[in-house]
From Swiss-Prot:
GO MF terms, alphabetically ordered: 2',3'-cyclic GMP-AMP binding; cyclic-di-GMP binding
Matching InterPro entries: STING, STING_C_sf, STING_LBD
Region named Disordered: 1-50
GO terms (BP aspect): activation of innate immune response; autophagosome assembly; innate immune response; positive regulation of macroautophagy; positive regulation of type I interferon production; reticulophagy
Gene Ontology cellular component terms for the protein in this record: autophagosome; endoplasmic reticulum membrane
Keywords noted in UniProt: Immunity, Innate immunity, Nucleotide-binding
Membership in a protein family: Belongs to the STING family.
Gene: STING5
Record's function text: Facilitator of innate immune signaling that acts as a sensor of second messenger signals produced by cyclic GMP-AMP synthase-like receptors (cGLRs) and promotes the production of type I interferon. Innate immune response is triggered in response to nucleotides from viruses and bacteria delivered to the cytoplasm. Acts by binding cyclic dinucleotides: recognizes and binds 2'-3' linked cGAMP (2'-3'-cGAMP), a second messengers produced by cGLRs in response to nucleotides in the cytosol, such as double-stranded RNA (dsRNA).
The protein, known as: Stimulator of interferon genes protein 5
Source species, domain of life: Eukaryota
Length: 306
């Protein structure tokens, strides 16, 4: 009869394929099980590493995509900035040119306004009265108007006789005294010049007496054309004379709107000329003769037909 210990030992024993029994508790320490666990652990580690590698690769791809996107965005922004800078530069250059041109135009406009407002509108309405007050010239004045000389070069002589020896100073009209700019009885006066045409050897000939003077603002344009900082070239200066004459004519003709007090119409004549080709005496007499011819033709047309 088998003992209890023998039976217990038999129950707790297991048999290997080779017939060698393995007791319970010794199974986990067998080489086969240990290797299996090692393989499983290694496989798990490999999977974890692969996941980590994939995640790292994904992160790097995301970072690379972000870099590419940023580069594209940066390039786009740079293009926009460059376009805006170019546009701004174009606008600034255009504005600058416009301002420069406008400034040059404003020179002519400003001079014309100043000449009209500060001088012509004050003296022209009084011109006929000053002529009538002159005992010396009241019956000699050829035309009761002020001839305003506008030389193309803007150069003005202190004495008109220096520009044309046939135009000689004969005297002044009575002065006008006007309160102006805080100055009491400021003096304004006009010079009368005599021209003898044609001058015979004995000095005789037909005498003309003109109230004539230079447009003094042209002296400013002349000085500007000689002053480097003014940046006014000779061709631009010549153009400014035309603009000055145009604006001055506009202002003088619109003086009719001043309720008669400053009406300058018919009391002036602007005389533009090229000093290299024209002589002042010839121009003045030609203007006078043409005006008389037109006047005579108008009178003939006004005579009723019998």
């Amino acid at each position: 009869m088998m003992s209890n210990d023998s039976q217990s030992e038999k129950r707790t024993a297991k048999w290997t394929g080779s017939g060698t029994p393995i007791a319970e508790g010794e199974e986990s320490s067998s080489p086969s099980a240990h290797q299996t666990r090692q393989k499983a652990t290694a496989a798990d580690d490999d999977d974890d590493q692969q996941i980590t590698d994939l995640e790292q690769e994904l992160a790097e791809l995301d970072l690379e995509e972000q870099r590419k996107a940023k580069k594209k965005r940066i390039a786009s922004l740079q293009r926009q900035i460059e376009e805006k800078r170019n546009k701004l530069a174009t606008v600034e250059i255009s504005d600058l040119n416009e301002k420069e041109n406008k400034n040059v135009v404003n020179v002519a406009d400003g001079l014309a306004w100043s000449y009209y407002s500060g001088y012509l509108k004050l003296v022209l309405p009084r011109l006929e009265q000053r002529i009538s007050e002159s005992e010396k010239f009241r019956h000699k004045i050829t035309d009761k108007k002020l001839y305003i000389l506008l030389p193309k070069s803007c150069f003005t002589c202190d004495d008109i006789e220096h520009a044309d020896s046939r135009v000689k100073w004969a005297g002044n009209l009575p002065e006008s005294k006007i309160n102006r700019g805080g100055i009491k009885e400021r003096s304004y006066k006009h010079a009368v010049h005599e021209i003898v045409m044609p001058p015979f050897p004995d000095g005789t000939g037909e005498k003309y007496h003109f109230i004539v003077e230079y447009a003094t603002p042209l002296m400013t344009l002349y000085d500007m054309s000689k002053f480097a900082d003014a940046q006014l070239t000779d061709p631009e200066r010549d153009h400014q004379v035309l603009l000055f004459m145009q604006k001055l004519t506009e202002l003088l003709e619109k003086s009719k709107d001043c309720k008669g007090q400053y009406d300058c119409r018919g009391k002036y004549e602007l005389v533009s000329f090229d000093e290299e080709e024209d002589k002042i005496a010839d121009i003045l007499i030609a203007r006078h003769n043409n005006a008389n011819k037109v006047g005579e033709e108008s009178e003939e047309l006004s005579i009723p037909v019998q």
